[in-house]
């Protein structure tokens, strides 16, 4: 199909009882629960580490730099990790990477408790954590569908997005409370302990078998094969580019929340917990709506509404001096983030065959992981130079250009592509 197709929404089978019926599968229920707790701990630590870094440096540039250093190895490794996830046990990959991340969390806590923590130590451990993230993320996303029957895969994908938003809603709020009453060290230690639960769960679950690529094929050849598969199909190519744009212009706001809390609203750096909690609550309510609506929501509609909401959120942040309105802006950003994540995630997971899924998800995640450090570094550095309000105005304007290009070109329709259109092998 060489001409733009009027795409249709994928019709998915349901086992009855709605998306929550999927929790009858023991392994999915266990992994969902453990991951929710552990990811909540990660967000708790993010609140603590952001506040710690800003208290040590009082510079938005350092916040951006710590994000860049932690995500650059993830960006560089993710495509190769996608090849790995398509040819070896995703379960084993996750067991190893979760262990590494647990060790970095305990090391960070030890340095803080020993009163020898410095910005460079935070960056160094963030780099190690980023290496683990690079190998982990593709395996995680492509592992979740293996915990349920194939016909219930997209229900699992949607609820995996809900799991992350649950963590985002609860983690920052708990992090703020733990930091206030127990200190930064308590938040970091809590996160370290939660990894034990995930590692134990990964030992006992039994994923279904799936098609894997031949190990005889070289890593570079496998990577190029996956890249061609994604590039030759415009809906998949568009998903990666939109993930990059949403991360650069929208999601990066999470990583400069400490600076915005102090510079825009004159709160302490720990005020980032309130902003991030509002973001998480927005994402949580958005996910509940998404689960109830299921397949009735068109992916193209979700994406367009998401970008419009991001622009509204950033514009409100640039204009208001009220911390409460700042929380409203982050709430709107949370709604936007969830809708974009579900739209793009289900597009790829629902149309790409198993033998390509690890690599397909790696390129999608590459867009996310590349956009966050670019956005956070640029926003943080520009904020230090020209002020955060002007920086946010420029950010909203850039995202508006993306929305305009998507609408004028008509490419937004490609987001509703069906598995049959993707499997044809011709550009849509």
Located regions from the model:
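Alpha-helical transmembrane-bundle signature of multi-pass membrane transport and export proteins
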Residues: 1-428
């Amino acid at each position: 199909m060489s001409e733009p197709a009027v795409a249709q929404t994928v019709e998915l089978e349901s086992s009855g009882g709605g998306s929550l019926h999927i929790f009858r599968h023991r392994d999915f229920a266990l992994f969902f629960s453990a991951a929710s707790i552990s990811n909540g701990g990660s967000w708790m630590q993010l609140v603590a580490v952001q506040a710690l870094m800003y208290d040590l440096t009082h510079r938005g540039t350092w916040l951006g730099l710590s994000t860049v250093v932690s995500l650059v190895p993830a960006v560089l490794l993710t495509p190769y990790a996608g090849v790995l996830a398509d040819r070896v046990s995703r379960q084993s990959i996750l067991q190893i990477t979760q262990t590494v991340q647990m060790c970095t969390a305990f090391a960070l806590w030890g340095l803080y408790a020993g009163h020898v923590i410095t910005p460079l130590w935070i960056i160094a451990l963030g780099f190690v954590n980023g290496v683990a993230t690079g190998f982990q993320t593709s395996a995680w996303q492509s592992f979740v569908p293996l915990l349920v029957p194939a016909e219930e895969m997209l229900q699992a994908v949607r609820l995996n997005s809900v799991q992350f938003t649950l963590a985002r809603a609860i983690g920052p709020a708990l992090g703020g409370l733990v930091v206030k009453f127990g200190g930064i060290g308590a938040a970091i230690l809590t996160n370290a302990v939660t990894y034990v639960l995930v590692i134990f769960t990964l030992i006992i679950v039994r994923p279904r078998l799936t098609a894997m690529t031949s190990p005889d094929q070289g890593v570079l050849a496998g990577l190029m094969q996956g890249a061609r598969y994604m590039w030759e199909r415009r809906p998949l190519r568009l998903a990666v580019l939109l993930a990059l744009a949403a991360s650069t212009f929208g999601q990066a706001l999470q990583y400069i929340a400490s600076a915005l809390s102090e510079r825009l609203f004159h709160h302490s750096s720990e005020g980032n917990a309130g902003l991030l909690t509002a973001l998480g609550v927005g994402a949580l309510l958005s996910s509940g709506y998404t689960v109830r609506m299921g397949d009735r929501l068109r992916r193209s509609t979700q994406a367009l509404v998401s970008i419009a909401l991001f622009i509204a959120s950033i514009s409100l942040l640039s204009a208001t001096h009220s911390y409460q309105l700042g929380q409203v802006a982050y709430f709107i950003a949370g709604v936007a983030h969830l809708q974009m994540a579900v739209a793009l995630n289900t597009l790829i997971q629902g149309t790409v065959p198993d033998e390509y899924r690890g690599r397909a998800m790696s390129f999608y995640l590459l867009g996310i992981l590349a956009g966050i450090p670019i956005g956070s570094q640029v926003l943080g550095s520009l904020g230090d130079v020209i002020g955060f309000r002007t920086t946010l105005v420029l950010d909203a304007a850039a995202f508006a250009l993306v929305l305009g290009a998507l609408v004028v070109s008509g490419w937004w329709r490609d987001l509703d592509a069906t598995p049959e259109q993707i499997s044809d092998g011709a550009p849509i």
